[in-house]
Design a protein with these regions (language model features):
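Short amphipathic alpha-helical patches
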Residues: 33-34, 53-54, 73-77, 81
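Terminal amphipathic alpha-helical/low-complexity segments used for targeting or macromolecular assembly
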Residues: 1-60
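A structural motif detector for beta-strand N-caps
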Residues: 60-69, 75, 79-89, 95, ...
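Solvent-exposed, flexible loop/coil residues
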Residues: 14-15, 19-20, 71-73, 93
Length: 105
C-alpha cells in the first residue's frame, strides 16, 4: 500500500507532520494572498484574490478584511455568505458554509 502524503493524512483527520515541506509551501502561498487581500481597497480586487485563494466562493459572498486562514483552498463558501471583520478560519480540513450564512460579530 503506497504511503499517503501529509496533506492526505491531514484531510483524513489523522496525525500528520505539520512541518511537511509541501504543506509549508501551501501556507506561504496563502500568506502572500492574504496580505494582498487585506490591503486591497477595491471590492472587485478582493473578490479576484478570494477566488484564487479559496476552494469556492459563492455568488455575492463577502469577507470583510482583515481575514485569516491557514490553507484557503479547503474553504468553500455558499452563495450570499457574509464573514465579518477579523474572521480566522483554521482550515486544516474542509470548511463549508451553506447559502445565506453570516459569521462574525
Amino acid at each position: 500500500m503506497p504511503s499517503r502524503t501529509e496533506r492526505e493524512k491531514m484531510l483524513a483527520g489523522e496525525a500528520y507532520n505539520c512541518l511537511d515541506a509541501d504543506l509549508e509551501l501551501e501556507r506561504q502561498k496563502v500568506k502572500r494572498l492574504l496580505r494582498l487581500y487585506n490591503l486591497a481597497e477595491a471590492a472587485a480586487e478582493r473578490q479576484t484574490i478570494l477566488r484564487q485563494m479559496l476552494g469556492r466562493v459563492g455568488r455575492e459572498s463577502i469577507i470583510e478584511p482583515p481575514f485569516y486562514c491557514v490553507y484557503g483552498q479547503h474553504i468553500h463558501l455558499g452563495d450570499h455568505v457574509y464573514l465579518n471583520v477579523l474572521c480566522t478560519i483554521l482550515d486544516c480540513n474542509q470548511v463549508r458554509t451553506g447559502h445565506h450564512a453570516t459569521i462574525g460579530p
